[in-house]
Amino acid sequence: MEKLILGLDPGLAVLGFGLIKCIYNSKTEKIDSTSLVDFGVIKTTKKQEMGQRLVTIYEDLHTILNNFKPDLAATEKLFFYRMGNTILVAQARGILILALAQNEIPLIEFTPAQIKQAVTGYGNADKYDVQQAVARELNLEEIPKPDDAADALAVALTASWLN
């Protein structure tokens, strides 16, 4: 069985996405192979009005969903850490939840510690350790750039293992 998993790292200025394909053994339901399909970012600028920034995120994400038709999406749970930044991330997150719901794509969420633990084996791993693990798991010669895309791939890998 084949499954396309979309990992998302929400942000208003930069929203990272990473898409992986997992092939599961039909008898054991364990993963036989995982491969990179695509990754990148959706960017907006402070010069754009808020509504236009959200429209950009929605339209670009909608294009990704239509082009790839993922079976599952995953993202990091939103935690309150800085009021202004949390509100901006929450707005972008609302747009991605809407786009996924409209396309009937299930969404699962993980804490940062769950993602770090799944990808590196250590819940307090730093960003570089996570990025190296992503490159290793997907047989990439280099760490995916930018960081937001690498983070999204870490979320997708976590979903493939924990879902």
Curated annotation (Swiss-Prot):
Keyword Magnesium listed? The answer is: yes
Q: What is its EC number?
A: 3.1.21.10
* Localization of this protein: Cytoplasm
Keyword annotations for this protein, in alphabetical order, are: Cytoplasm, DNA damage, DNA recombination, DNA repair, DNA-binding, Endonuclease, Hydrolase, Magnesium, Metal-binding, Nuclease
GO MF terms held by the record: crossover junction DNA endonuclease activity; DNA binding; magnesium ion binding
Residues bound to Mg(2+) 2 are: 76
The cofactors named for this UniProt entry are: Mg(2+)
Main subcellular location of this protein, as a coarse class: cytoplasm
Active-site residues per Swiss-Prot or TrEMBL entry: 9, 76, 148
Residue positions binding Mg(2+) 1: 9, 148
Which reaction does this chain catalyze? Endonucleolytic cleavage at a junction such as a reciprocal single-stranded crossover between two homologous DNA duplexes (Holliday junction)
Choose one Gene Ontology CC annotation of this protein and give it: cytoplasm
Q: How is the cofactor bound?
A: Binds 2 Mg(2+) ion per subunit.
GO BP terms in the entry: DNA recombination; DNA repair
What Gene3D superfamilies does this protein's entry cite? Ribonuclease H-like superfamily/Ribonuclease H (3.30.420.10)
Keyword 4Fe-4S on entry: no
The family classification in the record reads: Belongs to the RuvC family.
Q: Oligomeric state and partners?
A: Homodimer which binds Holliday junction (HJ) DNA. The HJ becomes 2-fold symmetrical on binding to RuvC with unstacked arms; it has a different conformation from HJ DNA in complex with RuvA. In the full resolvosome a probable DNA-RuvA(4)-RuvB(12)-RuvC(2) complex forms which resolves the HJ.
Q: What HAMAP family does the record point to? A: RuvC
Described function: The RuvA-RuvB-RuvC complex processes Holliday junction (HJ) DNA during genetic recombination and DNA repair. Endonuclease that resolves HJ intermediates. Cleaves cruciform DNA by making single-stranded nicks across the HJ at symmetrical positions within the homologous arms, yielding a 5'-phosphate and a 3'-hydroxyl group; requires a central core of homology in the junction. The consensus cleavage sequence is 5'-(A/T)TT(C/G)-3'. Cleavage occurs on the 3'-side of the TT dinucleotide at the point of strand exchange.
Specify the protein name: Crossover junction endodeoxyribonuclease RuvC
Q: What are the top taxonomic ranks of the organism?
A: Bacteria, Bacillati, Cyanobacteriota, Cyanophyceae, Oscillatoriophycideae
